[in-house]
Regions:
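Short, Lys/Arg-enriched, Trp-marked, Pro/Gly-tolerant hinge/linker segments that flank
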Residues: 124-135, 149-215
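Short amphipathic alpha-helical/adjacent loop interface patches that line ligand
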Residues: 98, 142, 164
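Ligand-binding loop in jelly-roll beta-barrel domains
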Residues: 76-99, 106-109
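Phosphate/oxyanion-binding loops and surfaces in catalytic or ligand/nucleic-acid-binding neighborhoods
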Residues: 99-103, 117-121, 148, 170, ...
């Protein structure tokens, strides 16, 4: 997977099958590409740092991440990945559609927990580090997912969904223990998304600051 495919996959590439909308990618910066510019998509994404360190930005919150840490990215969140100086970083992308966690229109778990988490009305930590009380348990969910995906024994999809539900249970439980401060300005985020989409559709034309201001 090259950087151009990665940049534009929301518009040009289906990441998952319709039957089981879940997939993973292993990436290395700068071996595979120098970085991932700001973008967003409709899928939920977990960035799991396997080796090294680098920068991950989520809704303009840029942080240095290290081996073992996890970044949770909601659908629609603007995010980017950058190299830290000369350091290398290997990471796993876990990408899946929210529908994977739904059991139907009247699913209480989806309505009461998952949807509020995904739309931002339920505040949770995005950057998951050893400072969190539940970090080891969260990391174990990822390890279990990796194991069953590697073996793919009959019923492995059930195990993936089970681990994802446990992951979000832990994440939501963690959020109840303390107040998560959020400084994102949703209005500016929507503006940024509009500008990025305009540039993508008109990149062959001469663009000015005035053009951007009128969007």
């Amino acid at each position: 997977m090259n950087i151009n495919e990665y940049q534009n996959y929301h518009e040009t590439k289906a990441h998952t099958s319709a039957e089981f909308p879940y997939n993973t990618y292993l990436c290395s910066i700068p071996l595979d590409f120098p970085g991932v510019p700001p973008h967003w998509h409709d899928e939920l994404e977990l960035v799991v740092i396997k080796k090294g360190q680098g920068f991950v930005s989520v809704d303009f919150d840029k942080r240095l991440v290290h081996s073992g840490e996890i970044v949770m990215i909601r659908p629609g969140c603007l995010h980017a990945i950058e190299q830290d100086d000369t350091f290398k970083m290997e990471y796993e992308n876990i990408i899946f559609k929210p529908d994977l966690l739904s059991s139907g229109a009247n699913d209480l778990c989806m309505l009461q927990y998952i949807m509020p988490l995904l739309d931002g009305s339920l505040s949770v930590e995005y950057f998951l580090t050893p400072a969190l009380e539940s970090f080891e348990a969260l990391s174990n969910c990822i390890r279990q997912i990796d194991l069953v995906c590697a073996d793919q024994t009959p019923g492995w999809q059930l195990a993936v969904k089970s681990s994802l539900f446990n992951f979000f249970f832990l994440l939501i439980s963690e959020s109840q223990k303390k107040t998560v401060s959020t400084s994102s300005d949703s209005k500016s985020l929507e503006k940024m998304k509009t500008v990025l989409k305009y540039v993508e559709n008109h990149y062959t034309e001469k663009l000015t600051i005035d053009d951007m201001a009128e969007l």
